Each structure stands twice: as C-alpha cells, then as structure tokens.
Amino acid sequence: MQICKKSSTFAGEMEHLSKAQIKWVRSLQQKKNRDAEGVFVAEGAKCVNDLGGSFELVLQANADNASVNEIEQMSSLRTPQGVIGVFKQRKEDLHSINEELIVALDGVQDPGNLGTIIRTCDWFGIHHIVCSRETADCYNPKVVQATMGALSRVHLYYVEDLSVILNQYKSKGYPIYGTLLEGTNMYNKASIPTKKKGIIVMGNEGKGLTAEVRKEVSHPLLIPSYPAGVATSESLNVGIATAIVLAEFRRNDTINTL
C-alpha cells in the first residue's frame, strides 16, 4: 500500500514523518516490497541530490522531519548519512537504445559488484546495461549506494532470456564480446574492431558466462595475466574486469580518432 506521496510536505516546512511512513521506508529494504511499490531508497545528500534529476522523489527524510533515531531506523547503513530519499523506479525501454557500446551482465549476483560496474560504466560513457534476471537488483540499497548517483545516468534493463536479446542484436550487426579464458588477448590490435557499437558481456562471479550466452559471443576476449606462463590468481573480480575491458575499448576509440 502506497502511503507516501509527494505533497507540500516536501516543500518549505516539512511535517514530521509518521510511524507508518518510517515503517514503510524500512520495509523497502526487501525487494518484494520495492517491486510492489515501484520505488527504491537512496541515502546521503549527494546521492539523493544526484538521483533527483532523473527519478521522481516520493519521500525525503532528514533532520527537518525525522529524529536521529528515526533516521537510523530507516537506514540500511551502519553509519546513516542523515538524508534518505525514496524515489519511483524508472520504466526502461530496451528498444530506445541507439547504436552504441552496451554492457550486458550474465548473472552478476553481488550487489557491491553491480554497483561498481554501474559506476564504472558511468565513468566510461556507457549509458545502457542489459541484465539477465539472475543479476542482482539495481535498486538494492547496497547497489544504489555503491553507484554514488550513477543510476541517474546509466539505464538498466532486465530481460527474461539474455541469450535471445544478444542474438537479436547480433543479427543487427552488433559484435558480441565476452571475457573467456579461451579468448584472444584483448591487447592484440585486431582483437577489438573499430565499430562504435557492440555489446560487452560480463559473467557470474563464480561460473562466468552461461552456455547459452557463450554461444552468442562472436568476439571472445582474454584479459591476460602477467607475466605470461606464471601462476597467478585464478580470476579477476568482475567489477575490476569490467573496468579493464572498458578502459581498453575507450583507449582504442581514442587511438582510432587520432
């Protein structure tokens, strides 16, 4: 039941939050409640302000309308930041994507990793992330906080079958890149074509890409360890791997425009 609506409460003098509103905000830490209400929670003045330009604010809690104890009750953080905002979730349209570089996530489950990836995409000018249903919820409080406001500029789309979507884009001429141990060293000049459009697929933290998604990869890439032939860590954190791949793609963009 929606009990918090935008009103004069959020302009000028703010009315003190009711117990029902405080309980409602606290309930939004659970995905089923966020989905039922179509909202999510952000914390911290900067994050709330950044998101305010792209998402509709439903409720705001701060020192003007809630006590320190009440802020702590609503917060999901160990150290509450004094400002909490509840925003409406955005309805995204996958068909609105133009020909550009896209990131796809195949079952990235850790909220911290997803938040890092969203923030990294924002840094490298990636505006769209297509996610499998098994990927963590982008409106999870941990994800929202990790993005540091990047959700206002990066759009996420959750799809029933990622392999089907990849196949559709491949038929439109999009190269599909995937990080695989049997891939081509991505630092080889020919590994990354000069096309501006494409989809970079990153896999699950423990299992990598699913078999179905792997079949759609047209350009398997390897992030090589150093030095070659010497035992190193088994794999990279998916957030770090995403940053390395995007940095190389953007470096190639720069070289190709010189």
PLM region spans:
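Structured adenosyl-cofactor binding patch, chiefly the S-adenosyl-L-methionine
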Residues: 123, 138, 145-150, 211-258
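Boundary-proximal intrinsically disordered activation/regulatory segments immediately upstream
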Residues: 2-61, 135-136
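Short beta->alpha connector loops at strand-helix junctions that form conserved
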Residues: 66, 106, 132-133, 155, ...
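Short pre-catalytic strand/loop immediately N-terminal to key active-site residues, enriched for Gly-Thr
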Residues: 38, 105-109, 227-234
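Amphipathic alpha-helical repeat scaffolds
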Residues: 44, 110-117, 140, 233-241
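Glycine/small-residue-rich loop that forms an oxyanion/phosphate-binding "nest" at active or ligand-binding sites
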Residues: 66-88
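RNA substrate-binding interface of SAM-dependent RNA methyltransferases
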Residues: 3, 96-183
